[in-house]
């Protein structure tokens, strides 16, 4: 069988366009009807070609898309139609450890970082004009000996002028105001919140997830997982013991509701959430 796409890695919907990165290191653009429009960039070793599609992001305000080539240490910038604009050198000490790049307005990028011995922080705030580090955010309380991250799950949302993001092993949702990280919501699900003191009880750990599993058995929450912003709601997931909750929080009314998607024999929301569009959840 012939299939245009390989396995889907990352999806972003902006400006009525669907940007899809697949497992073959290609970046496709479709319209909202699913019609193919164009590719972004060309993979190769020649001029203006990227060697690796390590990640991508979309600047929804200035209407361009950028590809990170970790091998070359480059950021390639294109129009939504796939026309090359320019390229930038990026700070390898930062971008070599990034797993997910998010545009968060005001000429800023928020980078979700791997958790391992070479990276001590969950996030890096980067200037989009220079691709230089401005500051690291949220030191990891446990550093894994392997490359581990929650970056394969979408954990940062930006829309309607709002920035929300989650931190590994935390029940808190944060925002960025005046260049500073600030807590804005705390999910109370009846379990204890993981903190630094709790994590130090049984050190050392091989990985941060080993620490998580040990603390869950002691009655601690495993922290928030993926996070999205619908038209009026924040949508996020959290696993607490054997229960996995899908939670919808109305930003205007400051009320919410939740579903347990791990009831015996029932999976209410099957598949991985790739992105959202208005009030629709896109799963694969």
Model regions: which residues?
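Beta-strand-rich domains and repeat architectures in extracellular enzymes and scaffolds
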Residues: 1-25
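Loop-centered beta-sheet repeat module
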Residues: 124-180
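Short beta-strand elements that form the blades of beta-propeller/WD-repeat-like
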Residues: 16-22, 63-69, 107-117, 124, ...
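Blade-loop segments of beta-propeller domains
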Residues: 2-7, 35-62, 69, 92
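Repeated scaffold domains used in trafficking and secretory/extracellular systems
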Residues: 7-10, 51-56, 95-102, 146-154, ...
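Short coil/turn segments at the loop-to-beta-strand junctions that recur within blades
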Residues: 3, 41-48, 90-97, 140-144, ...
